[in-house]
């Protein structure tokens, strides 16, 4: 299965009538492996800061998590494994695997829990596959 198929079929899938606003799978080096059409353009620096927060939990708390032009307030995640962010009625979930970051962005009516479930389910699967 191609990385794009993982994004299209597993991240952008419908959950209780809703789906993510955007999603991507990005390498630890910041290079996008696959992404949905609405995924924002981001800087390598954005991904470097996210990676640093996985290594040093709390790194993003003072400044927020930036993905392109959007700033998310970092909320409780799982140190070293999952970062969650909130902006208004939407937010972001980032799951770290051995080689990649699985990123999901949501807006209402999708809930944070639905976003977490979609992103973390694929991330856990990739971890099981050694990815």
From Swiss-Prot:
Q: Which InterPro entries match?
A: PFN (IPR048278), PFN_euk (IPR005455), PFN_sf (IPR036140), Profilin_CS (IPR027310)
Q: Could you tell me the keywords of this UniProt record?
A: Actin-binding, Allergen, Cytoplasm, Cytoskeleton, Disulfide bond, Phosphoprotein
- Protein's GO biological process: nuclear migration; regulation of actin cytoskeleton organization
List the cysteine pairs that form cystine. 13-115
Which tissues is this protein detected in according to the database? Pollen specific.
What is a GO molecular function of this protein?
actin monomer binding
User: What SUPFAM superfamilies does the record point to?
Assistant: Profilin (actin-binding protein) (SSF55770)
What subcellular locations does the record give? Cytoplasm, Cytoskeleton
CDD domains documented for this protein: PROF
Q: Which Gene3D superfamilies match?
A: Dynein light chain 2a, cytoplasmic
Q: Which residues carry this modification: Phosphothreonine?
A: 111
Please provide one cellular component term from the Gene Ontology annotations of this protein.
Answer: cell cortex
Task: Name the major location.
Answer: cytoplasm
Q: How is it modified after translation?
A: Phosphorylated by MAP kinases.
Kindly name one Pfam family recorded for this protein. Profilin
Primary role: Binds to actin and affects the structure of the cytoskeleton. At high concentrations, profilin prevents the polymerization of actin, whereas it enhances it at low concentrations. By binding to PIP2, it inhibits the formation of IP3 and DG.
Assigned protein family: Belongs to the profilin family.
Other remarks on record? The variability of the residues taking part of IgE-binding epitopes might be responsible of the difference in cross-reactivity among olive pollen cultivars, and between distantly related pollen species, leading to a variable range of allergy reactions among atopic patients.
Full protein name: Profilin-2
* Organism of provenance: Zea mays (Maize)
